[in-house]
Amino acid sequence: MILYFTGTGNSRYTAQELNRFCGDELVSMNREMRKRRQDPYNARYAYTSERPFVIVCPTYCWNLPKVVEEFLLNSRFLDSRDMYFVLTCGSGTGQAGKRAAQVCETLGLNFRGLASVRMPENYISLFRAPEPDEAVAIIRSSMPLVESIAMQISSGRDISDSFAGREVPSFVVRLFYRLFVHDRRFYVKDNCIGCAACASLCPTVNIRMRGGKPEWQGHCTQCQSCIGVCPVDAIEFGGRTRKKRRYYLFADGRQKFPNEKRETEEDEEKR
């Protein structure tokens, strides 16, 4: 079973490519997270698979996203006792492998390794997204590695991370979360069309529409989905994102361009 968490589509696309080679069940953690917040009594908390569990997600501050860690620690994994991690990143994964091993130990699972896949930069609250042609080149250059990872998992071998880089001190991670992982600086401009694409995709159900405009509720994970999916680029994060190109990767591998109508995740999966 491949469970993926995605903000702007990089990890979803990677999970889909892994699935193309592995032929396994594909589960959206985004959808599962929304269900847990909206209807906790009827949400799914147990996952059963005879094949290894494969967790695909972005790298947040050289570590596992806290929202993914919390999801895993509040889930039950049945039958298979093996878990792999595949993280998308712009550079290195730091101590993500160490933390993933700790999560597996807590869950009573066998940590079978972590591998990273370089994908286009999407964290425009700090950096700049690549131009479309450059993004395509980055994605294409990473797909042979994704196939190799899939083959290793299918054959039952451990995987390893060739892009881990140095471990980042824990105080740096804490400082990063305190300074950047919040929604206090998000705002919407006058060109917002009230389509609610941002609210429908938010994995933490952190956006509510009021008067046809999005309002953030204080439990943002900075996945960048809202700022990336907006069809008219109406969402900003303070002054850091002004005039920056947005990045969003559709399920079929296309990039979003300004003024392109945005489908919901459910719409995409029906195609």
Where are these regions (language model features)?
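FMN-binding flavodoxin-like domain, especially the glycine-rich phosphate-binding loop
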Residues: 2, 6-13, 17-33, 43-57, ...
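A short, compositionally biased domain-edge/stem linker segment
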Residues: 39-41
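A short, structure-level motif marking secondary-structure boundaries and short turns
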Residues: 84-86, 183-184, 211-212
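A mid-sequence, solvent-exposed acidic-amphipathic segment
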Residues: 165-195, 200-203
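Membrane/wall-proximal cationic-aromatic binding patches
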Residues: 36
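Iron-sulfur cluster-binding cysteine motifs and their immediate structural context
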Residues: 187-188, 197-221, 225-242
